[in-house]
Amino acid sequence: MSQAIDAYLDYLRDVRRMSPNTVVSYARDLGALTEYASKHHKRVEALDRRDLEAFARRLMANGLSPRSVARAVACVRGFYRFLLGEKKVAADPAEDLRAPRAWPALPTYLDLEAVDRLLAQPDVSEPRGLRDKALIEVLYATGLRVSELLALKPGDINLEAG
């Protein structure tokens, strides 16, 4: 299979004109795929869709960033498409392969000192300043996103509940 990998990398470099860094990354991804197949006592050309999905999940579990996993999945899809075109495989197990969804990054938050500085900004002697300070207070007190705050309607607010 290393001949097929070398041929694919040559194709990426010479025909598709991919950057050297991309080709190196794809070589690393295909090396990881080969290692994964070997650990499961299979040849790369014998992997099926379930194997490839498990491979992508393994990359996530190993701490690769979602972007790196997405690149590896794109590499694997392209590689199997290449193998199919070269008649090295009868079917493309990666045809509909998608990268697993990552947990969304946790939002960053302001420390107490930054909140105090933010609350001190609006000029509360002006109606707009009062409005802005109220909006900032609601954001801080409730943890709403800005889009959620902007979507609030007067009927959504229960002033008696506090």
Regions found by a protein language model. Give the residues of each.
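Conserved catalytic core of the tyrosine transesterase superfamily
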Residues: 1-162
